[in-house]
């Protein structure tokens, strides 16, 4: 599939996955599609292409949620400014005080592409879903930490049907250490099943209706668990699956585990031992993946293993 040239941080393999899933959805009943985290619209555009090629789509609403803002001193600003200058859309940025609003950039890249595109500009915590339609496909490129993901569970997962598709865009990501355990809990409770991966994205299918009581049970399980143990469990669960660029992305779960062991569990010795054994193993069989993983580890050290602070610069 040839996609429009739109700046963004998802890979071509992830664009193809978004297109394939959107095109294959059964939208013959009244369903909606939801995207959490749209940036400039690269992922949005991929989904739109799929929906436009979906023969069962007759008026489904596509809801997109994003603050469409960042702070000048935040982590996201370098990408917002850099991409907008490179693609010559920086005149569409609205700068006020320490804030940069890029909603008009998103509108520029998505204008007249899909009749029923509904934009929600707000922080995730302030989001609501009031559409009466069930959600056929939920694409999540927003929460990197469990407290935000818990909001997603409460706000959006209640509206998913059995058979609905969910893509966690940054699942195989060293920032996602507190989100990954929650997804393992959902696997253990047989709420979801594995479909496939593309780069850092994980595609799953909803196998059991998720209600408020189930969300409470997930949270109770999470609060009582050792996060690094849950990450190890999902690492083992997925080790036998076909994972895109297996050595790199699967072992990014180990990077997330190391971050959790240091930041959340104060287990520095265990994290050091795991780091040494991981790099010794991967370095022998895949030096290129080991080099990329080393960059993740250096990123941890640079930020004292506290990635929440970087995230907060953009969202608080």
List PLM regions with ranges.
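Conserved SAM-binding loop and adjacent beta-strand
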Residues: 4-17
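S-adenosylmethionine/decaboxylated-SAM
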Residues: 2-4, 23-312
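A Trp-anchored, charged/polar loop motif used as the substrate-binding/catalytic surface
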Residues: 15-20, 122
